[in-house]
């Protein structure tokens, strides 16, 4: 898989992830650990809620989005999260949903405090197999520039 650097990007670039199937088991395991509300834990109890069935925690959706974003852009040295300005869950994720993430680069600038790094502003839109938007996120991250990678290489003498 190709590694990306700040230098490879331009405003308007879009990247689409591979799909990921969300299983009931994954949904319940995440909920037990991190968001133990009844509509995430029990199919039967969830049927009596406003959701009319089991749903993923929004935080699980955010974690899936992060995984797919990282796998898709595969930044050399990783992407250092600087913050999320907006996070929305306009629809729910249910067991059996197949999730994909489309990332758009909305702004780029060199880091003023960290030479060799750039700051990217991105918009992630997470959808299910029906094209319904289940999450939107506007965030910023710091990623390495190619020159930084060259400066860090060592030679064996």
Language model segments and positions:
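Conserved interaction-surface patches within small, structured recognition/assembly domains
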Residues: 85-87
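HotDog/MaoC-like acyl-thioester-processing domains
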Residues: 1-11, 89, 93-157
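Hot-dog-fold acyl-thioester-processing enzymes
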Residues: 1-83, 146-157
